[in-house]
Amino acid sequence: MKRKKTETRPWDVAEHLKTEEDIAAYLEAVLEDGDSALISAALGDIARARGMTEIAREAGLGRESLYKALSPEGNPEFATVLKVLRALGLTLHVKAAHR
């Protein structure tokens, strides 16, 4: 008897970021980790979920530049991160770390 092959496709978090709450929870979890490459990639995931072209336009950046900056290999300037956060309708908050 031949086994049926199960077809799979890569999991894309951007497909699951449907609500503001989903997006906020995802970004908060990534920020807690503190890995700058992961934070950039997460912003890229969120931008893709919202529409990269629209986010690039609202941030005043080129679409290709934004893709590159927010890729796992990207290293965006902090100013770029702030522009993207604003374009996404998000803000950055700081709280004291417990030591």
What are the language-model segments listed below?
Residues E32, R48, S71-G74:
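Alpha-solenoid HEAT/Armadillo repeat architecture
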Residues M1-A42:
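N-terminal flexible/basic segments that precede or flank functional cores
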Residues E32, G60, A97-R99:
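Long, contiguous binding/interaction regions
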Residues F78-K95:
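DNA major-groove recognition helix of helix-turn-helix/homeodomain DNA-binding modules
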Residues Y26, L31, L66-K68, A79:
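Extended, folded domain segments that form the structural surfaces/walls around functional sites
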Residues R48-K68:
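Short alpha-helical DNA-recognition segment
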